[in-house]
A protein has these predicted regions:
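Structured, non-membrane catalytic/scaffold regions adjacent to prosthetic-group chemistry
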Residues: 6-207
């Protein structure tokens, strides 16, 4: 019972932390949606998927409860300047917003394992350029706090498609079930090779 109590306490503390968190202003906002972005058709999902309806696929039996105050991101491997970033470090960096669609590789035609959201965060390319990615580093291995890993092509993150370290989703801090305090979001890739939630390490390596 003690373990359950601690888990519930951590959940309460993280939810309270999220409620009190003020997001930084956005330096590069997303394009304004046209008035007709949402078609008036019965049964058609909204253009922006509400956070509560956004699909969740991961290997965590219990949603990790990670405080922004203890969170750190290590960037190492085949880089010239290994880095360790705190949540405050991310907040102090230029913030971008982008509408990005995520999909699970298992999503069938017409399935619900797909969602589109307005994400806010820091461009991962900028952080990696600061770390000095070595030319031979063809793969990014991202690791979550529960030791889940994903391998992402380095060239995809660096090609200008606005892959990011996201801190917010649809105008609010990431929900815990979607990776609070920080997750990866990479446009154009299935989640299993890119969308690491509760990300704590990014290692540059080879395939």
């Amino acid at each position: 019972s003690g373990g359950v109590g601690r888990m519930l306490q951590q959940r309460f503390e993280v939810n309270s932390e999220r409620t009190l968190l003020s997001l930084p202003s956005v330096d590069t906002p997303a394009d304004v949606l046209p008035a007709d972005a949402q078609l008036p058709l019965d049964g058609l999902d909204p253009f922006v998927t509400p956070n509560g309806d956004f699909y969740r696929i991961d290997t965590a039996l219990v949603v990790p409860q990670v405080s922004k105050d203890s969170w750190k991101l290590v960037i190492d491997g085949m880089v010239d300047n290994p880095m360790e970033l705190t949540f405050d470090d991310l907040l102090a960096r230029p913030q971008v917003e982008r509408y990005i669609t995520l999909s699970c590789v298992s999503n069938p035609v017409g399935g619900d394992l797909i969602g589109n959201a307005l994400w806010q965060g820091v461009l991962l390319r900028d952080v990696l350029e600061e770390a000095g990615v070595q030319p031979e580093a063809t793969q990014i291995v991202s690791r979550s706090i529960d030791d889940w890993t994903a391998g992402t092509p380095t060239e995809v993150v660096m090609d200008g498609r606005d892959a990011m370290l996201a801190i917010a989703m649809n105008g609010e801090p990431l929900p815990a079930r979607h990776g609070y305090p920080v997750r990866m979001v990479v446009p154009g890739l299935y989640g299993y090779v890119s969308a690491t939630k509760w990300v704590t390490r990014i290692e540059l390596t080879r395939w």
